[in-house]
Curated annotation (Swiss-Prot):
The organism of origin for this protein: Picea sitchensis
Taxonomy, superkingdom: Eukaryota
Protein name listed in UniProt: CASP-like protein 1U1
UniProt keyword annotation of Cell division present: no
Subunit description: Homodimer and heterodimers.
Membrane topology label: Multi-pass membrane protein
Residue spans, topological domain Extracellular: 58-83, 146-167
Location (main, coarse): membrane
Amino acid sequence: MESRTKLDYSETARSYTENKSGGNDAQRINGVYSSSFFVVDFSLRLLVIGSTFTAAIVMGTNKQTAILPIVGPLSAKYQYSPAFVFFVIANAVACGYTLLSLIFSITGKFTSTPLSVFLLSVTDLVMVALVSAGVSAAAAIAYVGYKGNSHTQWGKVCGIYDRFCHHGAGAIVASFVSLIIFMVLTVMSTYSFYRRTSSAR
């Protein structure tokens, strides 16, 4: 009877030790994942800030005056196209949001609870939609400027306003880069929310 009691005690102690060790391993793995996730998320959001800021500034300061025969001087400015105005606003909003989310991530506001991670993934998705709409509208106008449209008799203007078109193209490329990164961030934040909710069960 005594030997059986000792055997049961030994098995219980071994089981407790294994469970504790397994729990420590899981915590260690989660800790490594969390730190790696933070580094990648932080780096990508820095890139988004840089690309959206560049896109908004380059397009927002884009203008050129050309001298045309008979007509005289004519100016091209981003304000003359509602699509370009929306492009600047969309990238400025995305830049401001990303800066705030970066600050909140550093302080742990967006990574402390599953709800905050869920809100982060939703707002990242909203930014994907906003930047996508802005860059698509600007790209459509830029294409007409480069190629024209023979069906509607819209002529090319980039042969006249070459610098304006080149700067606009650079801003659009920068915005496309930020759009791709936002998509990656949305996937990451959604997966992080999934991990937190599944581990809480």
